[in-house]
Structure formats: C-alpha cells, structure tokens
UniProtKB/Swiss-Prot annotation:
Phosphorylated on tyrosine and serine residues. The gene is Dixdc1. It comes from Mus musculus (Mouse). Residues 278-295 have a biased composition (Basic and acidic residues). InterPro entries: CH_dom (IPR001715), CH_dom_sf (IPR036872), DIX (IPR001158), DIX_dom_sf (IPR038207), Dsh/Dvl-rel (IPR015506), Ubiquitin-like_domsf (IPR029071). Gene3D superfamilies: 2.40.240.130, Calponin-like domain (1.10.418.10). The coiled-coil domain mediates interaction with MAP3K4 and inhibition of AXIN1-mediated JNK activation through MAP3K4. It holds the Pfam family DIX. This is Dixin. May bind filamentous actin. Directly interacts (via DIX domain) with DVL2 (via DIX domain). Interacts with gamma-tubulin. Interacts with the complex composed of DVL2 and Rac. Interacts with AXIN1; competes with MAP3K1. Interacts with MAP3K4 preventing MAP3K4 interaction with AXIN1. Residues 237-254 have a biased composition (Low complexity). Residues 233-258, 271-298, 584-623 are annotated as: Disordered. GO terms for molecular function: actin binding; gamma-tubulin binding; protein domain specific binding. Residues 153-326 are annotated as: Actin-binding.
Length: 711
C-alpha cells in the first residue's frame, strides 16, 4: 500500500497535480488503517473528515502500534537497522486530544497536538501549519498522510522482513572470506560511480529541457500553462528514477535504499518551495511576483528557482558520492591491509601469502592496484588543486604588487601636490606681507589727510566767523537803510505837499498869464530835483556792490565762499526790487492825473543805474513774471547755479543784457542751452553783444567760463 502512495505520487502531491484516482488511493489507505479500530468511522473526504485532528490522532496510534508489532517479528541479525529506527517509541496514545471538538479552536488544538508529535519524533515533512489543515487544505493533509506512511511503513516492513527471513539461511552459509568482501566493496564502488554518472545525465537532460523552454519563451504564443506543464514534466523524471531505486529488490541496494529515500524526501523539500510559490501566485494574481509569470519576461521566477535548486542538489549529491567513495576506499584498505590508509606505516607489502589460493591473491593484488590508482588520482587532484591555489596566490601577489606600484605613484603625486601647495602658501604669505605694508602706508596717508582736513576746517571756521561779522555789518547797514528809507518817505511826503503847492501856484500863475496873452510856461526843475534827491541812494548801492566785489576777489577761484557772497548780493538786489515794487504800488494808489513828480522821479531813479549794475534778483516776483525772463547760469567757481530776472521777453534778450545782469569782471565765454533740429539738445556759444540769446523751455540756461586767452 505504501508503494502505491509513493510511486509516482510524491511530486504530484507536492505540486498539487493529483487526480481523483490518487485521492481515492489515499482514502483507501487511511480506511485500511482505521479498520483496526472498529469504533472509528471510515473516512469519506480527506478535506472534511481530517480537519478536526481526531482521525489523525487515531491514525498515528494505529500505524505506530503496527510498526512495533512488525518490529517484534523481525530477525535481530538481519533487521538491526529497523530496530534502531526513529519510530521505535511510536504507538503511544496522544494526550490532550478532544475526541468531539465543538468549535474551530478545539480543532486547531487537536491538529497542533498531532504536528507537535510529528516534530518530536523528527518525522520528515515540509512545513505545514495547523491553520491549513483546519481550513481543509488538501495538499497539506496529503503531505501529512504521506509523511506518516513513509515514516512508519507498516505495510512494507513485513515484506522486507519476510524476504530477509527467506534469504537469511542462504546468506548465513556463505563464507566471509577476503575475496568476497573485496568483490562486495568493488561492486558497491561501481554502484556509487553509476549513481554519480546517472545524476550527471539527469543534469544534462535538465539543461536540454531548459534549452527547449527558452525556445518556447521566445515563441510569441508562449503561455503560463505551457511553462507549468514543462515544470511538471521536469519533475517527473527524477521522481521516477528515485522511486525505481526505492522498489529495487536487490540485496546489494538494501543498505542504500534508506539513503535514496532520504534524498527523495530532500528533493521533495526542495520542490515544495516552487509549488507553494505557484499556489500563492494563483491565490494572489495582483502580487508583484505574479508579474514575473507574464509571457513578455525572459527568465521567470520558476525557471531560476528550479535551476538553482537542481544545481544545489547536484552539488550535494556529488559531495555525498565523494564521501561514499572515500568510505568505501577506506573499507577496502581495511579489508585488504588490516588498517586504514592514514594509519598505515612504512612496511613491505607481501605480494604472495602462504596458504592462499592464487586466484584470491590475484583478486587482492588487483584490488590493491585499483586502490593505488584511486589514491594516485586523488593525489593528482590534490596536486592540481595546490597548483591552482599557487597560481591564484601568484595572481594575487602580482595584483598586490601592481596595486602597491599604483599607490607609490599616487604617493609621489600627492607629494608633488603638497610641494606645490607649500610654494603657493609661501607666495600667498609674501603677498599678505606686501598688502599689510601697503595698508600701513595707506593708514599713514589717511592720518595726514585727516590732519590737513582739520586745518582746513579751522580755516573754514575762521572764514565763517569773518563772514558772520560781514553779515552783521550788512544787517546794520540794512537797518540804517530802512531808517533812511523811512526818512526818505517823510521827505517825499513833504516834497509832495511842496510840489502840490507849487503846482497850484503855477496853475494860478498860468491862468493869470493866459488871461494876459494865452501862453503857458513849462514846468522846470522837477526832474533835476528828483535826480538830486535820488543821488545818495544810488551811490550807497554802488558802494555795497564794490565792497562785495572786493570781498569776492580776496578768495581763490574754487573757494565755496563765492556762493555765500553771491547769495548776499542776490539778497540785496531782491531787497531793492521789493522797495521798487512798494514804491510802484504807492504810486498807483495815489492815482494822480498825469505824470506825478514822484513817477517822474522814480523813472529817473531807474534810469540813474549805471550800465554795469546788477538787475534785481528774484525767484518769485508776481509783478514782473509776465514781462521778465528767468536766467539760470553756472560758473566755474561754484557748483550751485545762479538765477536772475531780465525785464524782457524771451527772444528779445541779448548778450549785452545778460552781461549787465550777471555783472562779471574780466573776459568770459558764454554758452547757452539750445535745441538743434539735427543734433537735439546742444550748447550754443554767443560772441556778439547784439545777438539774441536762445531759450530752453521758457527760460535761459547759460554757462559762464573765464577766458584765459590773450587778447
């Protein structure tokens, strides 16, 4: 029954590629074991009946007891290995199992008890959780049943024991001579070599299948179903070979069958990983790993995992075969020489032993020769390995020497860079010293300039004190001028009364004369009186102007005091203009018919100004704004411009009028701002006195420069 479960069905269970017939075989085997307990109900469905864990507990108790019963009937000499197997303590009843579980938690507790028992007995089985069995996962349930059947083997133990019992008498009469032992060892060695070559052929066939799989992947109509079919086909070939070795009846393979079963179970453990990967990918199609199954990807997760597992399995088999060869060689040496190869000492080897059959001696000599050849091959392999290691060490040495040379070159480059950096550092230090010296020199010059500036400040304060004194004197003069103007107004009033009386007398006289002869005499002496009266005021103004001119000449050409003097002169002129305006308003208020003596005197006073006198300076005079032209001029002695008013309209002002307004001594050049149709805004120079001065936006802008050329 166990062979029915294991032959051809191990990988089917692991891959979940089982059919209904296989399920019925599992159900029949479980029911066959449960018949030993009539009180237990047979199983109908593995998914439903084994979920609670009760049937599993009964099954463990039954198959364990059967295994103990079968072990008792096995011959002690022939079945020594079976008597020392891991299920020796089986057959005991599981404690803590609920025979009638009422809820999900009790079912899970029963299954956990079963899994704990399986783990405690070290029964080979892939990782399975209690949750999977309680939920009715058929794959997990069949794994557990298969593990119990493979471990306890209640049906196959009798067959093996019977076969051994029948063959025991025959084998007991066989002579255990050295020749037979040597032949057995040689046969075992041949079997090992055959197993190694067979595993190599399996790898070769697997690589051929991989090549065909790559061709299918390149096919545009490749699908996941084709890949799964290819994967199932790859795993059937090693399972069939392993199962054939399991069912081999040869007595030579009896000791080797357990190791092959173990290898088959290890293969099952290896295969279980991709099968669970298939289940997870089918349950979760949206997971990231499911995208690796798409036909567009070149290397799939399944192919890579299976290839790695097969290569690891091949390496593991090769290691085991090498160890088996070493053990068999040591056994052969022990049988032939009486000691292991590592325990041998230098002693003469006798080719012929007395009292031994020559054929047996020939067999022994051939066995020794084979052993020597094997040892020679091993020594050659070790020699090649040592040579390869020596080559690797030599390559490492050359690489280290090359690296050391590169590091020496790098160190030299770093030293050169360090030397250049030190040279740059010294150069920067020298530059820093030069800059510090220049900074000290600049600081010394700055101190000298500060001293000179202090001296200039003191001189400026002295000049400012002098200017304040002059302004004080000027204010005193202005006060005196106001007093004089007040006296002048009083005298004008008296003069007006006198003139009025005189006019009345002249009128009376003329009326009398007209009555005489009809001739009117002209009025004389009025203009002379006004001129005589205005003479002292004109002389005072000329005196102030001369004093300011002499004060201006006492300063240098670019001294800022020129601006103060010009402002003073402009203030005096503005004051005179205001006096003139006041007199004009008074004359208009009197409204005397005809030209009054005061108007005549005022006109004569204006006409009495010298030709080079400064016209009144005003910036805001509403009386003369309509008939006057503003003139803004710059000089080379002051940065501040000056402004004067010329009592003429724009376009009628000549250079002579401008010269009379600014009142500058010496030779000068006159430039005026003008608009040229071709060049735009320009400076136009005027030479002749009768030439008209160009204007700019309703005013005149001029630059007055001293002419140092010789006449």
């Amino acid at each position: 029954m166990l062979a029915c479960l294991t032959r051809g069905n191990l990988l089917d269970v692991l891959q979940e590629g089982f059919n209904e017939q296989q399920l019925q075989a599992y159900v029949a085997w479980v029911n066959a074991q449960l018949k030993k307990r009539p009180s237990v109900k047979p199983v109908q469905d593995l998914r439903q009946d084994l979920r609670d864990g009760v049937i599993l507990a009964y099954l463990i108790e039954i198959v364990g007891q059967l295994a103990l019963d079968s072990d008792a009937s096995v011959d002690e000499r022939t079945d020594f290995f079976l008597l020392h197997s891991p299920f020796k303590a089986a057959g005991e009843k599981l404690t803590g199992v609920q025979l009638s579980p009422s809820n999900q938690q009790e079912m899970k507790s029963n299954v956990e008890r079963v899994l704990q028992f399986v783990a405690s007995k070290k029964i080979r089985m892939h990782q399975t959780s209690a949750k999977d069995i309680v939920e009715g996962n058929l794959k997990s349930i069949m794994r557990l049943v298969l593990a119990l059947a493979a471990h306890f083997k209640p049906g196959s133990s009798r067959t093996v024991s019977q076969g051994r019992d029948s063959k025991a008498p025959v084998q007991s009469h066989q002579p255990h001579c050295a020749t037979a032992v040597a032949q057995g060892a040689a046969a075992a060695l041949a079997d090992v070599c055959h197993d190694v070559s067979r595993s190599g052929r399996d790898v070769f066939r697997y690589r051929q299948r991989n090549a065909s799989v790559d061709g299918e992947i390149e096919n545009p109509y490749w699908s996941v179903r084709a890949l799964v079919q290819q994967y199932e086909g790859q795993q059937k070939s090693p399972s069939e070979s392993s199962c054939s070795s399991l069912t081999s009846p040869s007595p030579i393979h009896s000791a080797k069958s357990e190791s092959i079963i173990t290898q088959a179970e290890e293969k099952a453990d290896f295969v279980i990983i991709p099968s669970e990967g298939i289940e997870n990918r089918t349950d979760e199609p949206d997971s990231p790993s499911s995208r690796d199954w798409r036909p567009g990807s070149r290397g799939t997760y399944l192919e890579a995992t299976w290839e790695e597992q097969l290569l690891e399995q091949q390496e593991h088999l090769e290691k085991e075969m090498e160890e088996a060869k070493k053990m068999i060689s040591g056994l052969q040496a022990l049988l032939l020489n009486g000691s292991l190869p590592e325990d041998e000492q230098e002693r003469p080897v006798a080719l012929c032993e007395p009292g031994v059959n020559p054929e047996e001696q020939l067999i022994i000599i051939r066995s020794r020769l084979d052993q020597s050849v094997e040892e020679n091959q091993d020594l050659k392999k070790e020699l090649l390995k040592c040579k390869q290691e020596a080559r690797n060490l030599q390559g490492i040495k050359d690489a280290l020497q090359q690296r050391l040379t590169q590091q020496d070159t790098s160190v030299l480059q770093l030293k050169q860079e360090l030397l250049r950096a030190n040279m740059d550092k010294d150069e920067l230090h020298n530059q820093n010293v030069d800059l510090q010296r220049k900074l000290e020199e600049r600081n010394r010059l700055l101190g000298e300039y500060k001293k000179e500036l202090g001296q200039k400040d003191r001189l400026f304060q002295q000049q400012q004190a002098k200017l304040e004194e002059a302004l004080r004197k000027l204010s005193d003069a202005s006060y005196q001028q106001v007093d004089l103007e007040r006296e002048l107004e009083q005298k004008d009033v008296l003069l007006a009364h006198c003139m009025k009386g005189e006019t009345d007398e002249v009128t009376n006289y003329n009326s009398h004369s007209s009555q005489r002869n009809g001739f009117v005499l002209p009025v004389a002496g009025r203009g002379a009186t006004t001129v005589t009266h205005r003479g002292p005021q004109t002389s005072d103004l000329q005196l102030v102007r001369d004093a300011l001119r002499s004060l201006r000449n006492s300063f240098s050409g670019h001294d800022p005091q020129h601006h103060t003097i010009d402002s003073l002169e402009q203030g005096i002129s503005s004051l005179m203009e205001r006096l003139h305006v006041v007199e004009t308003q008074k004359k208009q208020e009197r409204k005397v018919g005809g030209r009054s003596p005061r108007n005549q005197a005022s006109s004569e006073y204006r006409a009495s100004w010298p030709p080079n006198s400064t016209l009144p300076h005003s910036q805001s005079s509403p009386a003369v704004s309509s008939t006057c032209t503003k003139v803004l001029y710059f000089t080379d002695r002051s940065l501040t411009p000056f402004m004067v008013n010329i009592p003429k309209r724009l376009g009628e002002v000549t250079l002579k009028d401008f010269k009379a307004a600014i009142d500058r001594e010496g030779n000068h050049r006159y430039h005026f701002k003008a608009l040229d149709p071709e060049f735009g805004t320009v400076k136009e120079e005027v030479f002749h006195d009768d030439d008209a001065i160009p204007g700019w936006e309703g005013k005149i802008v001029a630059w007055v420069e001293e002419d140092h050329r010789e006449n």
